[in-house]
Amino acid sequence: MIKVVFMGTPDFSVPILKQLIEDGYNIAAVVTQPDKPKGRKRELTPPPVKVEAEKHGIPVLQPTKIREKEQYEQVLAFKPDLIVTAAFGQILPKALLDAPKYGCINVHASLLPELRGGAPIHYAILQGKTKTGVTIMYMVEKLDAGDILTQVEVPITETDTVGTLHDKLSIAGAKLLSETIPQLVAGKLTPIKQDDEKATYAYNIKREQEKIDWTKPGEDIYNHIRGLHPWPVAYTTFAGNVWKVWWGEKVPAPKKAEPGTIIDIVQDGIVVATGNETAIKITELQPAGKKRMNAAQFLRGAGAHLTIGMKLGDEHES
C-alpha cells in the first residue's frame, strides 16, 4: 500500500483524513498548523486534524514555516509516495512538491479555475452561485493553479450557508479523493491545465467585507448574510454600536424608504429597506456585548425602543 503524508488543518480536512484511513492507506504522518490560542481564555487549542490524527496514533508535525529547509526535511524523512493536502494553510516548497512518486495533490473546495484562494466556500455564496464543487489537482508553487485531475459539482440551495455548504463539500471531497487516488496510481488520469484567464479569486475575508451595505439589492444582502454564517458573521451598526446579523430573510418591502431604514417591526423580525423592492427581515442578531438572540427576544428587551424610521448602518464603528 502506498505511503501517504496528509497535510490539513481545519474541520474541512477531517473527513478527508478519515477517508484516507478508511481506504487503508499507510498514513506515515499528518502535517498541520501549530496549536493556537482560542476563546476568551486564549487557551492553546490543537487543530481539528491533529485531534483526529492522534485518535489513530498517527505522528503529527506542526511546522510554523513549511518552506524552511529544516521544517520540510522532517516531512521528506517519511519518504511519502504521495502527499495529499486539504486546507493546510501554507504554500509548499518545490522540494516537497517534487519528492513523492505520485506527486502532491490538493483537495480544493471550488470548481477551479474559479475561486482560487482561502475562502472559496464563502465566495460561492456571497456571489450568489447556484453550484460549486470540489477539484483535486496537482500542487504547484502558485496559489491553486496546478493541473486538474478530477472535479465534482455540488449544488448550492437557496438556504445553504457557509456552514452547510462547507460540510457538503468536505464530504464530497473525501469521496472524490477516494475515487481519484487509485486512478492516479494506475496512470489512468490525464491532467488538464487550468485556464489562468478564467481564474477568479477568493481571498480570506477581511473585517471591512463583513459589514452589510444596505444600498445593495436585497438578494445580495441575503447572500451576504448566509455567505458569512456561521463565521465570521455579517454585521451592521445602529447608534454607534455593532449588531452581528446572524440570520435574515428576503421579504417584499411594504413601502419605499432610504436603504438601511427600519420599515416594519413584526413579532419575529425587524424589516429593513435595501437598494431594491426586496427588504431584509432580520430574525436573529447579537448586539454588542450581548448573547446571540432571536428578534422576538431582542424586541422584548434591548430592542424595545426601536421604531419604524430608525436607520441602520450609517454610523462609523465605535
Curated annotation (Swiss-Prot):
Family affiliation: Belongs to the Fmt family.
HAMAP family recorded: Formyl_trans
EC number: 2.1.2.9
Function, as annotated: Attaches a formyl group to the free amino group of methionyl-tRNA(fMet). The formyl group appears to play a dual role in the initiator identity of N-formylmethionyl-tRNA by promoting its recognition by IF2 and preventing the misappropriation of this tRNA by the elongation apparatus.
GO molecular function, one term: methionyl-tRNA formyltransferase activity
SUPFAM superfamilies xrefs: FMT C-terminal domain-like, Formyltransferase
Stated name of the protein: Methionyl-tRNA formyltransferase
Pfam families: Formyl_trans_C, Formyl_trans_N
Source organism of this protein record: Geobacillus sp. (strain WCH70)
One Gene Ontology term, aspect cellular component: cytosol
Binding-site residues, (6S)-5,6,7,8-tetrahydrofolate: S110, L111, L112, P113
Keywords: Protein biosynthesis, Transferase
Catalyses which reaction(s): L-methionyl-tRNA(fMet) + (6R)-10-formyltetrahydrofolate = N-formyl-L-methionyl-tRNA(fMet) + (6S)-5,6,7,8-tetrahydrofolate + H(+)
